[in-house]
Each structure stands twice: as structure tokens, then as C-alpha cells.
């Protein structure tokens, strides 16, 4: 569905009720809608300058990026319970999607937006600075080159899953959790087990996000870091990227 002519808190909440009629009230209680509105307007206004979205997505920012992210954040928050004292990183964040929507929670973690490309994320850095928004940090670095010791990491539209596990493995502390945003259940399970093993992770559980079916199949996985990665991992981005191009499972949201 195309975006409303003008974004307002009212138009965003109206679409929220249309898309998630049984959960809208609970979802609305989780978020600071003034901040959601400001960020949504920013995404639209800076889209062309920052090259945030494709031509199709530029007409459906609310459904395909804002509400999709908000629903993911809502479901993850229900599982986590409290974000108090935690740090969450978003790998390959682009302009801050989905990571910034964790900052839009009323009770939010410290959010670290991670991307090696400054073209998109520098606009978000300016947005955060000009609006004096605290609790957001920026890392202009490749995920596999960074060691941040975070509690949680997310990704959406990043390197294809399961190779994204390898790419982010050093971002998390031991017992930290990686929650990739995923599409169809079409990955090679043997490959997934292999990457989980050498990256030091185990699968805790997987959850389908049925209310997002208007966008296609969506699901999330909760992956716990149980040990340091094996020697030699994570590999350089060029190696991970080359191998991932033959992967069946995709982290990209279509």
C-alpha cells in the first residue's frame, strides 16, 4: 500500500491498526510515536540524497520499512522483556533500519548503528545530532572487523544468512544474542549448522511473523553466542561475500 500524502503520528497509527488490528494497542504502548514520526519523515525527506530505497520502496516506506521494522522490534522486545543496561548493534544498518526503531522504544537499549558505507548512515548521524537524541552510537566499519562486545545484534538485508552469523560473530560478547530478520524458510540446514558451529553459536529458537505476510514470508531466529569463533574466523569480507553468493538462505528481505 502506498504511503499517505503526509506522514503524521495519526496516519502512522491508523496504518498500524489496519495492518495489525489485534496487536495495535499493545504495539502502540511500546513506542515513542513522536520519535517514530520524526524518523519516518527524515527517511522520506533524505531518501533521494542518501539513496535509501529503491523506486518501488520509496512509495511504500511506511509499510515496507517503518511498520515492518516496528513489528519485528515489538516481537523481539516481548521475548527479551527488559532492555535495561543492554547494548544492541544493527549490522549493515544503511540509514538505521531496523536499528533506530529500537531507540524509538519507550524503554530502549543503547543502540549502535554499524555500516562501512557512510553515504546513508551519515545522514542519520546528522539527524540524531540535530535532534539531540541520546542513546545512539555510530560505527563506520565492516561488521567482521569490529569487536564491540554487545549484548544483542540484529541485521536486515545484510549479507545472506547463514553467513551473516560469521560476519557479526565478534560484535557480541559470550552469551550475547543475534537476531537476524529473515524471509522464507529456504536455507540449507546443514550449511546453517556448519556456520553456527565455526562461529561459536547455537540456535535457541525460530519464530514466524505471520502478521507480516502482506509483505511476504517473515521470520526471526534467536542465536546465542556460546563460544569464541574458531581460529581463522571471521574471514575477510571478500571471502565471506564470495562464498555467500552461492547460499540458498538469504538475509535479504524481498
Swiss-Prot record:
Keywords: Cytoplasm, Methyltransferase, rRNA processing, S-adenosyl-L-methionine, Transferase
InterPro entries associated with the record: rRNA_ssu_MeTfrase_G, SAM-dependent_MTases_sf
EC identifiers of the protein: 2.1.1.-
Pfam family of the protein (one): GidB
Annotated compartments: Cytoplasm
GO terms for cellular component: cytosol
EC primary class: transferase
Positions of S-adenosyl-L-methionine binding: 92, 143-144, 156
MF (Gene Ontology): rRNA (guanine-N7-)-methyltransferase activity
Main location: cytoplasm
Stated family: Belongs to the methyltransferase superfamily. RNA methyltransferase RsmG family.
Protein name: Ribosomal RNA small subunit methyltransferase G
Gene: rsmG
